[in-house]
Amino acid sequence: MTNIDVISDMLTRIRNSLLIKARKVNVINTKLTVNIAEILKKEGFIDSFELADATCLTENGVIKKYITIFLKYKGPKQVSYITKIKRVSKPGLRTYSSYKRLQSVAGGVGLTVLSTSKGLMTDRLARSNKIGGEILFYIW
């Protein structure tokens, strides 16, 4: 059985869905992906998400559950609220930062999502709580 990086998988699925202007995307249901979806919804990057009833039986007999993320677009040209998503810390190369060294993304328009001892949070919240952690990804 292979281990997959659920964060990279989630971000890649969102990125690919944005390229074809899909309204929704299914990602693997874990506590981590649900927390990331909550942050993206709260910050206005996605419209909503729901825990899907759909399950998938893989070839090795593992049942996977999914969450459905509804993507957000604006205007008649259907421009996405998400311009770019960049994964920073990877399983082979972890990246950590103190709250003092956190920089704003895209001039404050974007945000950094961190994994801290207090759970997942944005860079703004980490700075106000004076907590550093692992930089998961940038989004703007």
Curated annotation (Swiss-Prot):
One of the primary rRNA binding proteins, it binds directly to 16S rRNA central domain where it helps coordinate assembly of the platform of the 30S subunit. It is found in: Plastid, Chloroplast. Its main location: plastid. Disulfide bonds: none annotated. Coiled coil: none annotated. The keyword Chloroplast applies. Belongs to the universal ribosomal protein uS8 family. One of its GO terms (biological process) is translation. It comes from Euglena gracilis. The keyword Kinase does not apply. Keywords: Chloroplast, Plastid, Ribonucleoprotein, Ribosomal protein, RNA-binding, rRNA-binding. It comes from the Eukaryota. Pfam families: Ribosomal_S8. Part of the 30S ribosomal subunit. One of its GO terms (molecular function) is rRNA binding. GO terms for cellular component: chloroplast; ribonucleoprotein complex; ribosome. This is Small ribosomal subunit protein uS8c.
